[in-house]
Every structure is written in C-alpha cells, then in structure tokens.
Amino acid sequence: MPAVKRKAPPTLGAKLNRRVRPRFEAEPDSDVEEGSSDEAPSEEEGGGFHTGSDTEEEEDEEVEEGSDDESDAPSEHGGAGIDAAQLSFGALAKAQASLGTLKKKKKGSKGGDDESDDDEEKEEPNWKTEIEKGLKSKVEKHHRTSKHAPVEMTSKKPVSRRREFLVTNDAPAKPKARDPRFAPPGLGGSISGGSKAVVDEIKARKAYSFLDDYQEDEMKQLRMAIKKTKDAHEKEELQRALLSMESKKKARVRKDKERELLSEHKKKEKELIKQGKTPFYLKKSEQKKQLLVEQFASMKKSQVDKAIERKRKKIAGKEKKALPFARRTAEDR
C-alpha cells in the first residue's frame, strides 16, 4: 500500500484566522428529486458519496491553504483581509488578547529606546544651559511669599578671598557677628561680654522680675503636694524639683547681691573721681570678702557658726584629697 502523508494539525493562529465559508444549499425541485430517486438510486448514492468526499477533501485543502496564507497575511498586512462577521465570539476574544500582548511588547521596546535616547542626551552636558542657570541663581533675589512674611535670607556667606598675612596687635579686633538665637537669654546676642552684655542682663532681670512671684507660688504648691502625697517615688520626684528651684533661687539672690555691691562701689568711685582722686577697681577676691561680710551680718550667731563649720569641713576634705598617698614600707607588707 502506498504511504499516505498525514498533514500536520493546524496551529492556534491558523485556527483563529481561518476563513469560514458558508455553504449555500439550493432548494431542489420536488419533481426532479422524486424522478431521480426512482430512476437510479444506487448510482446517485454511490456517485454522490464519492463526489462528496472529493469535494470535502478539496475544501479542507483550500481551507488549510487559506489558513496558511492568512496566518502569514496578518504579519505582512496587519490582518486587513479577515472578516470579523464570519468569526465566532470566542475566536475574536482570543485574537484580541493576543493583539493586546503584542501591543504591550511593542510599547515596551519603544519605551526602552526612548530611555536609551534620554540617557544619551543626559550624558551629553549642555554647557550653555548650565552657565545660564548659574547666572540666574546669582541674579535671583530673595523675596517674601507675602507682604506680612519675614524676609528670607541665606545662611551661606561667601568667604573673602583676601588673606591677612600681616596681623599686628595694634590693629583693633573686628567684632564677630553671631546669631542671636544661640546667645544666652538676656545677653542680646553679645557673647564676648563687656559692658553691653552686663547692661542687657540687668535690663532682662528687671523686665522679668515678676517671674520670681510665680516661682514662689510654684514652690508653695510643691511643698503642699509633698505633704499630701503618699507614694514614695512621686514624693522623691517632687522633692528633687523643689530642691532645684530653691538652689536656682539662691543663685539668683547671690547674683543680685553681687550686682548691687558692684553698682554701689561704682557710684562711690564716680564721686571720688569727681573730687580728683584715682579710681579703685575691686578684685574678685575683694568682692567675695565683702559679700561674706554682708551675708554674716544678716545671719544669727548660731547660723554663722554652722556656716563657718561647714566651710571648714569643705576645705579640709579638699586638702585631704590633694595629699599624696603614703608609700608602703616593709612593715606594711
């Protein structure tokens, strides 16, 4: 028997793009059909079967050839020859899904090309635009967002290109500008000290003297809370807060006394200078002595004795710490 070549099954694309041809069956005349059936039923049956099989094979070949041609056609002409009215809804849905994936792939390839072009453009520096930007940034002035907003100033100050290679002691020192936000409160931004700093501190102390009354009230409330509370941990915290407030108050009072002492001494010296005498400036040690004299003058005898004993113990402890340790001898071993 001769070997029969089997055709390969059509692919999914060929099935989807296959052209379906409708079969038009003409309505046969009843008289002709009856006559033909009576005359030669066996011949028509045999011939009809043979001719039908031949026609079916020819149609299959045509369909396969058409499917092959049409499968190649969409790639070349974009699928213009397909009639959508002759396809089923399932075939159309599958075709639409396959077209969507193709479009995405094409877009991705285009996007990659664009990105590569952008990278190439970025790599090539445009010197003119950079120079123009630098000039614009220099020309641009700081402006306010609204008329009520504060003026915006840059914190970046350029360093001077001039170098002072010859510095003499006779030349006056230039005042260094400092940010007033980082200055101690009450000094008005002058960190270096001097008369201005002292004056500003005195003014601030006078302006905020009403805070002493508030602090006294807070200390009274803390004492009352310490008496009422039974929790040991909370009591310790309140006592610590009260102790810190009392120590701050003592330091403030001591500073006020020092300031009063200096102001009185300056007044006396000014009067003596007017009389033609030379001025006398108090040293730090003299200031401390006068402060101790005034402090003991306002205290009772028992309080003075206690203060002296406390001071003596403090000095003795410092002296003991300053002494070197005794060396070990053979007897100590």
Curated annotation (Swiss-Prot):
Q: What does the protein in this record do?
A: Component of the 90S pre-ribosome involved in the maturation of rRNAs. Required for early cleavages of the pre-RNAs in the 40S ribosomal subunit maturation pathway.
GO cellular-component term (any): 90S preribosome
| Domain of life the protein comes from | Eukaryota
Q: What ranges does the record list as Basic and acidic residues composition bias? A: 124-138, 316-333
Task: Family membership, please give it.
Answer: Belongs to the RRP36 family.
Please give the name of this protein: rRNA biogenesis protein RRP36
Q: Does the keyword Nucleus apply?
A: yes
Coiled coil, from the record: 215-275
- List the InterPro entries: RRP36
* A single GO BP: maturation of SSU-rRNA from tricistronic rRNA transcript (SSU-rRNA, 5.8S rRNA, LSU-rRNA)
Q: Where in the cell is it found?
A: Nucleus, Nucleolus
Keywords (alphabetical) are: Coiled coil, Nucleus, Ribonucleoprotein, Ribosome biogenesis, rRNA processing
Complex formation: Associates with 90S and pre-40S pre-ribosomal particles.
- Region Disordered: what ranges? 1-85, 99-194, 242-262, 313-333
Question: Which Cys pairs are S-S linked?
Answer: none
